[in-house]
Amino acid sequence: MDKKTIIGVVLMSAIFIVYMVFTSRQQTQYQEYLKQVQAEEQLLESEQKAQAEQNNEAEADPVSAEDAAAAAHQRQVDMFGEGLVAAKARQAEQLTMQNDYLTVEFTTQGAMMQKVTLAEYTKFAPKGERNQKIVLFDPESAYFDMEFYLKRNLKNVKVNTSEYVFTSKGITRGEGKQTLTMALEVSEGAYVEYEYVLYDEKNPARDYMLDFNVKFVGLSPIMAQQSTVGLTWSNRTYQNERSFKAENMYTTLSYRLPEEDDVEDLGMSEGEASEQLQSEVNWVAFRQQFFSQAFIAADNFAYGDMKFNTMESGSGYMKEYSARMGMNYTPQTEGYRFSIYCGPNKYAVLSNVVGPNGDDILMERLIPLGGWLVGWFNRWIVIPVFDFLRQYIASFGIIILILTILVKLLIFPLTYKSYLSTAKMRVIKPEMDALNAKYPRQEDAMKKQQEMMALYKKAGISPMGGCLPMLIQLPLLWALFRFFPVSIELREQPFLWADDLSSYDSVLNLPFSIPFYGDHVSLFCLLMCVTMIGFSYFNYQQTSSSAPQMAGMKFMMVYMMPAMMLFWFNDYSSGLCYYYLVSQVLTMVIMMGMRRFVDDDKIRYIMEQNKAKQKNKKKSKFQLRYEELMRQQEEMMRQQQKQKAGKR
């Protein structure tokens, strides 16, 4: 055996011996670890057994349990006081106040309104089954809380009134009102008092209102230093109308800032929305399409943190609302005065509502009647006429028909002027065609425009004569578009096959849903679109001959727009679709009548006379400046054309 072989055998033997020693030690350590784990498990088991025996002994000893409960009770008393501890353990009661318009149910748990039922309005249901009254507060989610801090043993303790059961002093009646008083004792001789007042005497300003007064009695010495008292008001509203989509379009959280002439809101969208205001807020309202709940402060809220969350379609609910407000507080504060509105979004009612101080708080602006111009038309023209007709006519379908006729009569001078302008354009069409043939090139567009304007002037035609009258009447037409979907007067009013003019009329329920259209067929919407096709085709025939550029828009005017309206309006108010149907039929009748009685030859004769007069008429300074401007623009275009040609 050579030297290298001997060295290799020795090294291998040494490595094997070291490996055996190392693994033996690891095995020994592992066994020791297992013994340690087993010992710890046995110790834990014995401790748990001992603890269980101690618990059994404590349960077997009622004196020890009572002592523990007494000690816990004393800790609560030391922290909150005897009055609040007793209030938390008290059994809640239910109380009810009622007048001809509202039934209001209260609970002494937090001394809050739990349910409000409207006597005159019912929830949508199929014909013959509509008997469920509108409920504005959901008892499961209605919540009101006042939060403030007390001084207790050198500590500030937070008090949330919703956690405590108030003591009811009962309901008293007299002087045309009912008063419910509930109190929460905070300390001996110190308490918070809630007073709710519901009026029996009929008064448009108070029919749907409650006064809500908060009084702090003897609290000032034990109140901690704080600048505001917090208020939290939340609720979940029911779906009351036929269409979730249509109702949601007008359901939002609204609020008004002091001294403002308009109302703000969080938007009328699905999903969630929120807003935090560090400025004062006059009132906050949980608004639906036709009903609202509003919380109004006499001295304004110091701030407002508001939000809503849209519920799922088919859940039976619309939105969850939450509003956290603050009221300014000083040691001299003796309480606060509020008003609570629970009622319809009816202009005649809301316009009479005043705040706790008797001031106008613009509650009627809750109804989305449009911006300043459109809203003005609705408030001062549409609504007064509508209310006047209601006094003498029972059928709202007939009222809409008469209102449409009145609108057409009102705008007839503008319609006639627009038609006359179109007729004049039709008469001078040969001259216009000659100008188009004379100046076919793009660089001559300015010169063609000049001669076209001269032709209009000689013929006595205003370039805006056709569209300006239509623009003037747009605010009124848009006002009616905004009025019908939010008019509670149409709610529950049937007409022909429609059960409710405030909702869509379904003559056929589909077993499936068509995207952007829905799962039903609205007959008023369908008839509106059919008449729109007829009206658009008739209007196209009238304008295409006088305006060649309209020829390429036939598909859009005659077919595309009515098809789009069919999808848009299938879920809209049947009253609105009925109005557009009647409006288009009347417009076609008027246009056919004017077409029959307006003589093109007579118009041509008058235009020839105007041309003769224009020849001898001196040009005005404005016309001279306009012609000079046109010449300068034409020269600029020629220079640009030359520059482009030079670059090539």
At which residue positions do the language-model features occur?
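Transmembrane alpha-helical core residues of multi-pass small-molecule transporters
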Residues: 12, 407, 531, 582-586
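Transmembrane helix interruption/hinge and helix-loop junction motifs
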Residues: 3, 393-396, 568-577
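Membrane-interface amphipathic helices and adjacent TM-edge segments
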Residues: 26, 40-44, 410-477, 533-570, ...
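Residue-level signal for the membrane-embedded core of alpha-helical transmembrane segments
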Residues: 13, 397, 401, 471, ...
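Membrane-protein biogenesis/insertion across secretory and organellar systems
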Residues: 1-409, 604-648
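Core hydrophobic alpha-helical membrane-spanning segments
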Residues: 8-21, 477-480, 526-531, 564
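Transmembrane alpha-helical segments that form the functional core of multipass membrane systems
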Residues: 365-438, 447, 453-457, 477, ...
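Conserved catalytic motifs of ABC-family nucleotide-binding domains
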Residues: 479-533
